[in-house]
Regions:
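Bacterial N-terminal signal peptides
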Residues: 10-24
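General helical structural elements
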Residues: 9-11, 60, 157
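C-terminal/domain-edge helix-coil "capping" segments
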Residues: 27-42, 62, 67-74, 97-102, ...
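N-terminal secretory signal peptides that target proteins for export/translocation
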Residues: 1-5
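Short, solvent-exposed, polar/charged sequence segments at loop or secondary-structure edges
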Residues: 69-110
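A short acidic, glycine-rich active-site loop
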Residues: 52-59
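Short, well-ordered secondary-structure micro-motifs
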Residues: 44-46, 89, 121
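Acidic/histidine-rich, surface-exposed loop or edge segments in extracytoplasmic proteins
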Residues: 35-51, 79
Length: 169
């Protein structure tokens, strides 16, 4: 083999090997399942908004899934359960954990939203490392508004918060 050919081959091998150390290129995607979110309304408003809130909370979870999926280093897996919502409260913790494990995901994202007043809502988001049964994130969030835009902004914030908790995992 000629000296030039040997140098080219060595350079190619070095470049390929250096790619293995670039974050995001060598690691498998993080697997996450996002459960449904619970919802409680204690605002005392006269108008029944149950149907609207049910749709918004479902869309909230969908947006969190979409936002996390948009990252190339994250794979969001389906969370299946016999009936919705798929939450620790509606299913019971043992059934919820069993369903979470069936997803094959390493992490499960879950939580709930509480409408406290006409404009103020509080949420709780948790991320559990399923194999280690270790809580990695427990974050309260507060947001103003009871419309699609308020939920969209809250879902974006929650997605960013979860993504930050996953860094280096």
């Amino acid at each position: 083999m000629s000296m030039v050919r040997a140098k080219v081959l060595a350079a190619i091998c070095g470049a390929v090997l250096s790619l293995a150390s670039v974050p995001g290129l060598s690691a498998a995607p993080i697997t996450i399942a996002v459960a449904d979110f619970d919802y409680v309304d204690t605002s005392g408003e006269a108008r029944d908004q149950t149907a609207e809130h049910k749709l918004r909370v479902a869309k909230f979870a969908e947006l969190v899934r979409e936002n996390l999926s948009a990252q190339g280093d994250t794979s969001v897996l389906a969370f299946e359960c016999p009936r919705h919502p798929c939450t620790p409260i509606s299913m019971g913790s043992d059934d919820f954990l069993a369903a979470a494990r069936r997803t094959g995901a390493r992490f499960i994202v879950y939580g709930g939203i509480h409408k406290m007043s006409t404009l103020v809502q509080n949420g709780l988001v948790e991320v559990l490392d399923l194999p280690g049964e270790k809580l990695l994130l427990r974050r309260t969030v507060s947001f103003r508004g009871d419309n699609d835009e308020a939920y969209r902004r809250a879902a974006a914030f929650v997605s960013d918060t979860v993504r930050d908790a996953m860094k280096g995992r």
